[in-house]
Amino acid sequence: MASQTQGIQQLLQAEKRAAEKVADARKRKARRLKQAKEEAQMEVEQYRREREQEFQSKQQAAMGSQGNLSAEVEQATRRQVQGMQSSQQRNRERVLAQLLGMVCEVRPQVHPNYRVTV
């Protein structure tokens, strides 16, 4: 009987060791999966940063030339407005005199299409 209980004890201990090994293997596998997931996440983040940086540089290059164009257009517009204002200042008195002359100087005339009927 003693040898039988001893054999059962050995089997139980072997089963316990096997269960511990399986549990350790599962833990190692979980750790490896977690580590692989973290590494993949870091790679994705690094790739995302690289692409974002590339996009920003291309956008800056495109917007830089557009910004210069915008500044040139704005400067040309200012020059035109300034030219119009100076022209208005130069011609103001002459135009006012012409308008007042046309309004105040009335010359009565008979319309050419008017027919006198007697």
From Swiss-Prot:
It is a peripheral membrane protein. GO terms for molecular function: ATP hydrolysis activity; proton-transporting ATPase activity, rotational mechanism. Residues 23-91 are annotated as: Disordered. It comes from the Eukaryota. GO terms for cellular component: clathrin-coated vesicle membrane; extrinsic component of synaptic vesicle membrane; melanosome; synaptic vesicle membrane; vacuolar proton-transporting V-type ATPase complex; vacuolar proton-transporting V-type ATPase, V1 domain. It holds the Pfam family V-ATPase_G. InterPro entries: V-ATPase_G (IPR005124). Belongs to the V-ATPase G subunit family. V-ATPase is a heteromultimeric enzyme made up of two complexes: the ATP-hydrolytic V1 complex and the proton translocation V0 complex. The V1 complex consists of three catalytic AB heterodimers that form a heterohexamer, three peripheral stalks each consisting of EG heterodimers, one central rotor including subunits D and F, and the regulatory subunits C and H. The proton translocation complex V0 consists of the proton transport subunit a, a ring of proteolipid subunits c9c'', rotary subunit d, subunits e and f, and the accessory subunits ATP6AP1/Ac45 and ATP6AP2/PRR. This is V-type proton ATPase subunit G 2. The lineage of its organism: Eukaryota, Metazoa, Chordata, Craniata, Vertebrata. The gene is Atp6v1g2.
